Amino acid sequence: MSNYQQESSYQYSDRSNNGQQQEQQEKKEVEHSSYTHTDVKVNMPNLIAPFISSSAGLAQELVGEGFQASVSRITGASGELTVIDTEAETEEARRDLEAKAREQELLSRQFEKELERKTEAYRKQQEVETEKIRKELEKQHLRDVEFRKELMEQTIENQKRQIDLEARYAKKELERERNKVKRVLERSKFHTDIQVNMEAAAGSTHSGSSSVAVSESEKFQTNN
Protein backbone atom coordinates (compact mmCIF):
# COMPACT_ATOMS: atom_id res chain seq x y z
CA MET A 1 0.00 0.00 0.00
CA SER A 2 1.11 3.60 -0.61
CA ASN A 3 2.00 6.03 2.18
CA TYR A 4 -0.39 8.57 0.70
CA GLN A 5 -4.13 8.29 1.23
CA GLN A 6 -5.77 8.21 -2.15
CA GLU A 7 -9.42 8.50 -2.98
CA SER A 8 -10.56 6.95 -6.24
CA SER A 9 -14.03 6.87 -7.66
CA TYR A 10 -15.11 4.12 -9.98
CA GLN A 11 -18.09 4.22 -12.27
CA TYR A 12 -19.67 1.08 -13.54
CA SER A 13 -21.68 1.20 -16.74
CA ASP A 14 -24.52 -1.23 -17.41
CA ARG A 15 -24.56 -1.61 -21.14
CA SER A 16 -27.88 -3.55 -21.18
CA ASN A 17 -29.91 -0.99 -19.13
CA ASN A 18 -28.29 2.46 -19.23
CA GLY A 19 -26.20 2.36 -22.44
CA GLN A 20 -22.61 3.27 -22.78
CA GLN A 21 -21.40 6.19 -20.65
CA GLN A 22 -17.87 7.61 -20.69
CA GLU A 23 -16.32 10.10 -18.36
CA GLN A 24 -13.19 12.04 -19.08
CA GLN A 25 -10.56 11.90 -16.42
CA GLU A 26 -9.66 15.31 -15.15
CA LYS A 27 -6.00 15.83 -14.62
CA LYS A 28 -3.93 18.77 -13.56
CA GLU A 29 -0.41 18.94 -14.88
CA VAL A 30 2.22 20.79 -12.93
CA GLU A 31 5.50 21.53 -14.61
CA HIS A 32 8.43 22.22 -12.34
CA SER A 33 11.94 23.03 -13.40
CA SER A 34 15.00 23.78 -11.36
CA TYR A 35 18.45 24.99 -12.38
CA THR A 36 21.70 24.36 -10.55
CA HIS A 37 25.07 25.64 -11.73
CA THR A 38 28.25 24.18 -10.33
CA ASP A 39 31.72 25.40 -11.16
CA VAL A 40 34.43 23.11 -9.85
CA LYS A 41 37.82 22.08 -11.13
CA VAL A 42 37.13 18.38 -11.05
CA ASN A 43 34.97 16.26 -13.30
CA MET A 44 31.41 16.16 -12.06
CA PRO A 45 29.93 12.66 -12.08
CA ASN A 46 26.80 12.41 -14.17
CA LEU A 47 24.42 10.49 -11.97
CA ILE A 48 21.10 9.35 -13.34
CA ALA A 49 18.23 10.40 -11.12
CA PRO A 50 16.42 7.40 -9.62
CA PHE A 51 12.96 6.69 -10.97
CA ILE A 52 10.37 5.25 -8.63
CA SER A 53 6.93 4.44 -9.88
CA SER A 54 4.28 5.88 -7.60
CA SER A 55 1.21 4.05 -6.52
CA ALA A 56 -0.96 6.24 -8.73
CA GLY A 57 1.03 5.20 -11.78
CA LEU A 58 0.78 1.58 -10.73
CA ALA A 59 -2.99 1.83 -10.37
CA GLN A 60 -3.21 3.51 -13.77
CA GLU A 61 -1.15 0.70 -15.25
CA LEU A 62 -3.33 -1.99 -13.68
CA VAL A 63 -6.80 -0.63 -14.44
CA GLY A 64 -6.01 1.96 -17.08
CA GLU A 65 -7.13 2.41 -20.61
CA GLY A 66 -8.68 -0.60 -22.33
CA PHE A 67 -8.69 -2.89 -19.28
CA GLN A 68 -11.86 -4.89 -18.77
CA ALA A 69 -12.49 -6.08 -15.21
CA SER A 70 -15.22 -8.52 -14.24
CA VAL A 71 -17.43 -7.25 -11.44
CA SER A 72 -20.26 -9.77 -11.84
CA ARG A 73 -20.46 -10.24 -8.10
CA ILE A 74 -21.39 -6.58 -7.76
CA THR A 75 -23.42 -5.68 -10.83
CA GLY A 76 -23.78 -8.97 -12.59
CA ALA A 77 -22.08 -7.58 -15.69
CA SER A 78 -18.65 -6.64 -16.88
CA GLY A 79 -17.65 -3.00 -16.68
CA GLU A 80 -14.73 -0.73 -17.54
CA LEU A 81 -12.85 0.80 -14.62
CA THR A 82 -11.31 4.25 -14.94
CA VAL A 83 -9.00 5.76 -12.36
CA ILE A 84 -9.81 9.39 -11.62
CA ASP A 85 -7.50 11.50 -9.46
CA THR A 86 -9.26 13.70 -6.99
CA GLU A 87 -8.30 17.31 -6.39
CA ALA A 88 -6.70 16.36 -3.08
CA GLU A 89 -4.59 13.70 -4.75
CA THR A 90 -3.54 16.11 -7.49
CA GLU A 91 -2.58 18.73 -4.92
CA GLU A 92 -0.71 16.14 -2.90
CA ALA A 93 1.15 14.97 -6.02
CA ARG A 94 2.08 18.60 -6.78
CA ARG A 95 3.38 19.11 -3.24
CA ASP A 96 5.34 15.86 -3.46
CA LEU A 97 6.88 16.97 -6.75
CA GLU A 98 7.91 20.30 -5.24
CA ALA A 99 9.29 18.57 -2.14
CA LYS A 100 11.20 16.15 -4.34
CA ALA A 101 12.70 19.05 -6.29
CA ARG A 102 13.69 20.82 -3.06
CA GLU A 103 15.29 17.66 -1.69
CA GLN A 104 17.14 17.08 -4.95
CA GLU A 105 18.43 20.64 -4.86
CA LEU A 106 19.46 20.19 -1.24
CA LEU A 107 21.27 16.96 -2.08
CA SER A 108 23.00 18.72 -4.97
CA ARG A 109 24.18 21.53 -2.69
CA GLN A 110 25.38 19.05 -0.09
CA PHE A 111 27.21 17.11 -2.78
CA GLU A 112 28.83 20.30 -4.08
CA LYS A 113 29.96 21.30 -0.59
CA GLU A 114 31.35 17.85 0.08
CA LEU A 115 33.10 17.87 -3.27
CA GLU A 116 34.59 21.30 -2.56
CA ARG A 117 35.72 20.15 0.87
CA LYS A 118 37.42 17.05 -0.50
CA THR A 119 38.97 19.05 -3.35
CA GLU A 120 40.40 21.59 -0.92
CA ALA A 121 41.72 18.84 1.34
CA TYR A 122 43.33 17.15 -1.65
CA ARG A 123 44.89 20.43 -2.76
CA LYS A 124 46.37 21.07 0.68
CA GLN A 125 47.69 17.52 0.83
CA GLN A 126 49.28 17.98 -2.59
CA GLU A 127 50.92 21.20 -1.41
CA VAL A 128 52.39 19.40 1.59
CA GLU A 129 53.65 16.54 -0.57
CA THR A 130 55.09 19.00 -3.09
CA GLU A 131 56.93 20.84 -0.34
CA LYS A 132 58.36 17.57 0.93
CA ILE A 133 59.52 16.67 -2.56
CA ARG A 134 61.11 20.11 -3.00
CA LYS A 135 63.04 19.82 0.25
CA GLU A 136 64.14 16.31 -0.63
CA LEU A 137 65.35 17.52 -4.03
CA GLU A 138 67.33 20.29 -2.33
CA LYS A 139 68.95 17.72 -0.06
CA GLN A 140 69.68 15.54 -3.07
CA HIS A 141 71.32 18.51 -4.81
CA LEU A 142 73.57 19.11 -1.80
CA ARG A 143 74.47 15.43 -1.75
CA ASP A 144 75.32 15.61 -5.45
CA VAL A 145 77.59 18.62 -4.87
CA GLU A 146 79.40 16.87 -2.02
CA PHE A 147 79.78 13.73 -4.10
CA ARG A 148 81.26 15.66 -7.02
CA LYS A 149 83.62 17.46 -4.66
CA GLU A 150 84.81 14.19 -3.11
CA LEU A 151 85.15 12.65 -6.57
CA MET A 152 87.33 15.55 -7.75
CA GLU A 153 89.51 15.36 -4.66
CA GLN A 154 89.95 11.63 -5.10
CA THR A 155 90.83 12.13 -8.76
CA ILE A 156 93.49 14.73 -7.93
CA GLU A 157 94.92 12.54 -5.19
CA ASN A 158 95.07 9.59 -7.55
CA GLN A 159 96.88 11.68 -10.16
CA LYS A 160 99.43 12.76 -7.55
CA ARG A 161 100.01 9.15 -6.61
CA GLN A 162 100.38 8.20 -10.26
CA ILE A 163 102.94 10.99 -10.75
CA ASP A 164 104.87 9.92 -7.65
CA LEU A 165 104.84 6.35 -8.90
CA GLU A 166 106.11 7.36 -12.33
CA ALA A 167 108.83 9.53 -10.78
CA ARG A 168 109.98 6.77 -8.45
CA TYR A 169 110.28 4.21 -11.20
CA ALA A 170 111.83 6.76 -13.56
CA LYS A 171 114.47 7.44 -10.92
CA LYS A 172 115.17 3.73 -10.67
CA GLU A 173 115.45 3.53 -14.46
CA LEU A 174 117.92 6.42 -14.50
CA GLU A 175 119.95 4.75 -11.79
CA ARG A 176 120.11 1.58 -13.84
CA GLU A 177 121.21 3.55 -16.92
CA ARG A 178 123.89 5.30 -14.88
CA ASN A 179 125.19 1.97 -13.65
CA LYS A 180 125.28 0.64 -17.18
CA VAL A 181 127.31 3.64 -18.39
CA LYS A 182 129.64 3.29 -15.44
CA ARG A 183 130.25 -0.36 -16.23
CA VAL A 184 130.94 0.47 -19.87
CA LEU A 185 133.43 3.14 -18.92
CA GLU A 186 135.21 0.82 -16.52
CA ARG A 187 135.66 -1.79 -19.27
CA SER A 188 136.50 0.64 -22.08
CA LYS A 189 139.95 1.03 -23.76
CA PHE A 190 141.58 4.42 -24.28
CA HIS A 191 143.98 5.01 -27.19
CA THR A 192 145.84 8.34 -27.31
CA ASP A 193 148.22 9.56 -29.99
CA ILE A 194 150.22 12.74 -29.36
CA GLN A 195 152.30 14.40 -32.09
CA VAL A 196 154.36 17.57 -31.43
CA ASN A 197 156.18 19.44 -34.21
CA MET A 198 158.35 22.48 -33.47
CA GLU A 199 160.00 24.55 -36.20
CA ALA A 200 162.89 26.96 -35.41
CA ALA A 201 165.59 28.83 -37.32
CA ALA A 202 168.24 26.44 -36.17
CA GLY A 203 166.24 23.37 -37.01
CA SER A 204 163.09 21.42 -36.25
CA THR A 205 162.01 19.13 -33.48
CA HIS A 206 159.58 16.29 -33.75
CA SER A 207 158.09 14.49 -30.75
CA GLY A 208 155.34 11.90 -30.58
CA SER A 209 153.82 9.47 -28.17
CA SER A 210 151.20 6.76 -28.26
CA SER A 211 149.41 5.29 -25.25
CA VAL A 212 146.78 2.64 -24.82
CA ALA A 213 144.88 2.29 -21.53
CA VAL A 214 142.68 -0.65 -20.70
CA SER A 215 140.34 -0.33 -17.70
CA GLU A 216 138.26 -3.22 -16.38
CA SER A 217 136.66 -3.45 -13.01
CA GLU A 218 137.49 -6.42 -10.90
CA LYS A 219 134.74 -8.80 -9.86
CA PHE A 220 134.75 -10.60 -6.56
CA GLN A 221 132.69 -13.68 -5.91
CA THR A 222 132.06 -14.93 -2.40
CA ASN A 223 130.89 -18.44 -1.74
CA ASN A 224 128.90 -18.85 1.42
UniProtKB/Swiss-Prot annotation:
One of its GO terms (cellular component) is cytoplasm. Residues 24-38 have a biased composition (Basic and acidic residues). Residues 159-177 are annotated as: CAHS motif 2. Residues 1-38, 200-224 are annotated as: Disordered. GO terms for biological process: response to desiccation. Its main location: cytoplasm. This is Cytosolic-abundant heat soluble protein 77611. Keywords: Coiled coil, Cytoplasm, Repeat, Stress response. Induction: Expression is highly induced during desiccation. It comes from the Eukaryota. CAHS proteins contain 2 repeats of 19-mer peptides designated as CAHS-motifs that comprise each two octapeptides connected by a tripeptide. Residues 80-191 form a coiled coil. Trehalose, a disaccharide essential for several organisms to survive drying, is detected at low levels or not at all in some tardigrade species, indicating that tardigrades possess potentially novel mechanisms for surviving desiccation involving tardigrade-specific intrinsically disordered proteins (TDPs). Disruption phenotype: Results in a significant decrease in survival after desiccation but does not affect survival under frozen conditions. It is found in: Cytoplasm. Residues 122-140 are annotated as: CAHS motif 1. CAHS proteins are cytosolic heat soluble proteins that seem to contribute to the anhydrobiosis in tardigrades, but their specific mechanisms are yet to be identified. It is possible that protection during anhydrobiosis might occur via the stabilization of vitrifying small molecules such as sugars, but not via the direct glass transition of CAHS proteins themselves. Residues 1-13, 200-215 have a biased composition (Low complexity). Belongs to the Cytosolic-abundant heat soluble protein (CAHS) family.
